[in-house]
Amino acid sequence: MGRTSEWYARHVGDSFVRTSKAWGYRARAACKLKRLDAKYGLMSRQCDVLELGSSPGVWSQYISYERRVSGMAWRTVSVDTRAMVRVRGVSFIHGDITEAETMAEVSSRLPSGVGLILSDICPHPSCERYLDSIATAKVAETLLMVSRRFLLDGGALLHKTFVIRAEHIASVMERHFSSVEVYRDASSRSFNSEAYLLCVGD
């Protein structure tokens, strides 16, 4: 069996993939966010939400559904350099969050800031440790820049990363947030080694 065939066999047999499709979500990432939401009460926050790296829109779908079910009218703005199919109740910005024009557009749609930032700006690890360190530092810098600009006091930032990068990013965030927790759940396959950082401000 070739590498692609092996991946496909794992993919279709994955219980999280089956569950996500049964719920009508675009990918298995919905299951991961649902677990994190159950653990940390993310969607129970009475606040606007900013989502970074939103394409293909799985987290946006989950946010939209949970907000509709709860009757919340808070705004959700998602940003990505890649195009994304429209999600009901979510305002999408096709742009780079590190660019001034995109930041200005986010500000115009979320003038009062947000209480929750969800981030999936997570480039895959490089086999070159030096290059990977640079990429990790850039991600941490971007998260801090966006948090300082938009995150309200007491707000939370949830960032998806890889285990190999989690400690580095957490060490940076701990200097700027009152609490930082690293979480990894059963829906992260071992060869992916995904981890999630929950950073909460004062």
UniProtKB/Swiss-Prot annotation:
<keyword id="KW-0808">Transferase</keyword>
<protein>
    <recommendedName>
        <fullName>Ribosomal RNA large subunit methyltransferase E</fullName>
        <ecNumber>2.1.1.166</ecNumber>
    </recommendedName>
</protein>
<comment type="similarity">
    <text>Belongs to the class I-like SAM-binding methyltransferase superfamily. RNA methyltransferase RlmE family.</text>
</comment>
<keyword id="KW-0698">rRNA processing</keyword>
<keyword id="KW-0949">S-adenosyl-L-methionine</keyword>
<feature type="binding site">
    <location>
        <position position="57"/>
    </location>
    <ligand>
        <name>S-adenosyl-L-methionine</name>
    </ligand>
</feature>
<feature type="active site" description="Proton acceptor">
    <location>
        <position position="160"/>
    </location>
</feature>
<dbReference type="InterPro" id="IPR029063">
    <property type="entry name" value="SAM-dependent_MTases_sf"/>
</dbReference>
<feature type="binding site">
    <location>
        <position position="59"/>
    </location>
    <ligand>
        <name>S-adenosyl-L-methionine</name>
    </ligand>
</feature>
<comment type="function">
    <text>Specifically methylates the uridine in position 2552 of 23S rRNA at the 2'-O position of the ribose in the fully assembled 50S ribosomal subunit.</text>
</comment>
<keyword id="KW-0489">Methyltransferase</keyword>
<dbReference type="GO" id="GO:0008650">
    <property type="term" value="F:rRNA (uridine-2'-O-)-methyltransferase activity"/>
</dbReference>
<dbReference type="InterPro" id="IPR015507">
    <property type="entry name" value="rRNA-MeTfrase_E"/>
</dbReference>
<feature type="binding site">
    <location>
        <position position="120"/>
    </location>
    <ligand>
        <name>S-adenosyl-L-methionine</name>
    </ligand>
</feature>
<dbReference type="GO" id="GO:0005737">
    <property type="term" value="C:cytoplasm"/>
</dbReference>
<dbReference type="InterPro" id="IPR050082">
    <property type="entry name" value="RNA_methyltr_RlmE"/>
</dbReference>
<dbReference type="InterPro" id="IPR002877">
    <property type="entry name" value="RNA_MeTrfase_FtsJ_dom"/>
</dbReference>
<dbReference type="Pfam" id="PF01728">
    <property type="entry name" value="FtsJ"/>
</dbReference>
<keyword id="KW-0963">Cytoplasm</keyword>
<feature type="binding site">
    <location>
        <position position="80"/>
    </location>
    <ligand>
        <name>S-adenosyl-L-methionine</name>
    </ligand>
</feature>
<feature type="binding site">
    <location>
        <position position="96"/>
    </location>
    <ligand>
        <name>S-adenosyl-L-methionine</name>
    </ligand>
</feature>
